Amino acid sequence: MMLFNSVVTLAAAMLLLPGQAMAGTYKGFSMGANRADGACKTQADWKTDFQTIKGWGKGFNAVRLYAASDCNTLANAVPAAKATGIKLLVGVWATNDAHFGAEKAALLKAIKAHGTAWIAAISVGSEDLYRKDITPQKLATEIYDVRGMVRQYNKNLKVGHTDTWTAWVDGANDVVTKACDIAITNGFPYWQGVNSKTAIQKKTFQNSFWSVQKHVKAVNSKAAVWVGETGWPTAGASFQGAAPGTTSLKNYYGSVACWLWAKPDTSGFWFTAFDAPTASPEVEKHFGVADSKRKLKFALPC
C-alpha cells in the first residue's frame, strides 16, 4: 500500500445481481501471506481465508496475492484456491534479479503442477514505479519476460503491473503501460488526507480512476484497467484530514465498493479482508473489513 499526498484510485468488478459476480470479471480482496501471528500461512490457513470470504455471500470469487515464492505463497494458496473455487491474481516481485528469478520459478512450478485455470491474471511488480525501485524500461522487459513464459502454457493469460494512480498517469512510465495487458491501479483517499465524507461527496476515488483509465487507453487501447487496492482503516493514527473509524470504513465501502462492483467491465480487489496485527505502522493493522479473527466489522452491503 502506498502513502502519497495526491488523488488516488480505485475501480473494480462486477454484478449481474446483488452478490452475483459477472462471468469474466473478478471481485475480491488483496491479501498478504502472513497469519495474524506473523507466521506464513499454510494451505489450511489459505483455505479457511477463501472459505470465509466466499461465505460472506457477496459473490467474491478472487484474491490478489503479492508474491509467488515468498512464504511459499503459490505452493500453499493454489491448492486451497482450487478447492474453494477462488481465482488468483498472482503477484511476481519485480525488483532484485535473484528475487525476480525465484518468483518466476515458483509461478512456473505452480503452472506445471496445477495448470492455469486457477489464474485470474499475473501482476509483475507492485508500486515499483511509485517507489522508483526499478526503471520503467526494465520493468517493461520483465513483463514481456513473464508473459513469454506463461503463454507457453496458456496463450490467453493476461500479464500486467500494479501501481499507484500517479504512476499510471505519468508519461515517463508509458513504456510499462504499452507492455501491459492489464494496468492495475491502487488508490487510497485516506492517504491523500481526505476525510471519508469529502472523499465520498467529491468522488475522489472515482475521478482518479477515470483519469487512469483515460491515460492508459490513450497509450494502449487494448489494456484493461483493474483495481488492486483501496480501503479505509478503522483504528490507528489520522493522516492529515483523514481519520480512521468503523463508520468511515462502512460509509466508504458502501460508496466505493458498491460503485466498483457494479461495473460490468472492471475487476477489482479491496484492501483488505482481515486485519493484520503484525503490520506496521499501527494504522496498517486495521484495514480489514473483518478483524484478525475473521469477524466482519459491519454487514457488507455488496
Please state what every model-predicted region is.
Residues 75-158:
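Substrate-binding cleft of extracellular glycoside hydrolase catalytic domains
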Residues 26-110:
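N-terminal carbohydrate-binding/catalytic regions of secreted carbohydrate-active enzymes
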Residues 34, 238-246, 260-302:
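Aromatic-rich peripheral "rim/lid" segments of glycoside hydrolase catalytic domains that contact
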Residues 150-169, 218-230, 265-278:
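Aromatic-lined carbohydrate-recognition surfaces of secreted/lumenal glycan-active proteins
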Residues 32-34, 66-68, 93-97, 124-129, ...:
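Active-site beta-loop-alpha junctions enriched in small/polar residues
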Residues 84, 120, 126, 163-207, ...:
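Aromatic- and acid-rich polysaccharide-binding/catalytic face
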Residues 27-31, 61-65, 86-91, 120-124, ...:
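Hydrophobic faces of well-ordered beta-strands that scaffold small-molecule active sites
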Residues 1-23:
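Fungal secretory targeting signals
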